[in-house]
Amino acid sequence: MRHPLLVDLDSGVMVPCNEDLGLELLTAADGVARFLWLPSERSINGHGVVHGGYIGATCDAAIGYALASRLENAEGFTTVSLSLTYHRPLRRETAEASAQVVRVGRRTAYVEATLRTEGRLVASAVSTLLIL
């Protein structure tokens, strides 16, 4: 049984918060997800770069879709922890978010993500998720 997140994509529907971010899903299969993202003007902070919260939300979205593609019984899940490391500022340019499931246990999962632009690492994230 496919996870509801992925079933909705088959009909062209994306979770509203991801739609608001402007994410374009490239793939979500076998524990891996990839998005393209062009940050909106509204995501730019007072320093002229993308606010870190938008970067975190984008990484979290990739993490969620990667895990959804790995779960076999359409279980729900929620983030327990999300740790971000910012490697360089992101201007308003297209970036690719990718996530890969590292481990799935009976009740928890561990997923890693990166955000890159033109091959350069912008941010990396690690997340622990509770399987409901």
Task: Name what the model sees in each region.
Residues 1-132:
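Terminal targeting signals and extreme-terminal segments of soluble enzymes
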